[in-house]
């Protein structure tokens, strides 16, 4: 298996290198027609891709770090329209230097309807996933040069997942995605899920998901025979339903999940705006901890503020400690207000961001989850703070304070001081 993965890694790398056009003398019109414009190139980089002729190399897989794998490095990519407008290949392979394991995904898809942008995708994945994390199928790709939370995560579960996925655009404003998947789950930490007289250390899950994103206020135009979003409108709404089936393709549990999120952006004037994100989730039935919810904590368990000094996340709770809370029902509200940048010089313009976050949650049958200790959010969790971004080379500072129902006795334990990193391409 390792030889096969190394071969896949070498093949992807060689393909990316050889798919780039050789540098030759051409007239200006040929260069303009045959090369990616600077704007398009920066858009690719901003989305985490290095474009070549037939393959867009995925920068997410080059180098990462977390507490379980240590350094995680590899290569991945997706074929582009120059390769084919009807078929695509989307794969990666990575290696963790601390756990000494290869992880990989082999996937591809084919388009069955151009007008509705309907694709059928197939994939086989052998990788890790953070316990308690959740995402929407319809979410657009999100890329950061480095992911702040990832540095300190240690609670992962292994999964081998086979999936078939259908993307379909009902209208320009309403896109859907449906997925059928079977997964073998094995937590990397000490955990048993107890139901009656049965105790599960590892388990199989068979799920069906349907996700829909509605953007009623966005504007779209047809440009070069392709529908393009010309204005991003708010609010946006995302809904996802998940059903797990027992005794279907060896599934061990019946459970149902519903997840909802809305995003709203209020633009006051030039470069002054507010962002509001409301998220919620509910899991019923026999749901293991791996598929429940945390509130995206981003604080490590160390003695002093300086020892906890790290990188602030985008939408994470900076004063909430990792693995401190889990819920089978939760809601979070996050509000950010971006003040007009301070014009110190023409190019040096730091920006103040005021932040307030709130989380509420609970859990039934908490005794089912054995060999792990955590709390719930039934008292309501609150934090407030601010960021000063782009102080130097894209770096800034972040401060947050924990108050309310989960305020801690020691002042310093409620305080989080971190740096931020923002770069615009």
Regions found by a protein language model. Name each.
Residues 21-95, 99-425:
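Exposed, low-structure sequence patches enriched in small/polar residues
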